[in-house]
Design a protein with these regions (language model features):
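Metallo-beta-lactamase
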Residues: 2, 9-14, 19-96
Length: 96
């Protein structure tokens, strides 16, 4: 799903795992992703909460977020930004 905000098109990506309704927002024109609590610098969102799912979280990251360009800058819900390529290479929570 895409929505426009002024000159930006926001792509809403359903990324369940941390929560069933989790989303990430990708701005292709700027090559940035707002990942919320799905993906962090060398980490992932918590899945020990009610209705969260580790399996769904990993699938969301591998099958959706890791399909974005490697140089996509990821702004996380907490902490420092990262890139999709950096996470593919260094995030041991999402290996395999």
């Amino acid at each position: 799903m895409a929505r426009g905000v002024k000159d930006l098109e926001l792509e809403i990506i359903h990324t369940p795992g941390h929560s069933p309704g989790g989303i990430s927002i990708y701005i292709r024109k700027e090559n940035v992703l707002f990942a919320g609590d799905t993906l962090f610098l060398q980490s992932v969102g918590r899945t020990d909460l009610p209705h969260s799912s580790a399996e769904d979280l990993i699938l969301s990251i591998k099958n959706k977020l890791y399909k974005l360009p490697e140089d996509t800058v990821v702004y996380t819900g907490h902490g420092d930004p990262t890139t999709i390529g950096g996470e593919k290479r260094g995030n041991f929570f999402v290996q395999g």
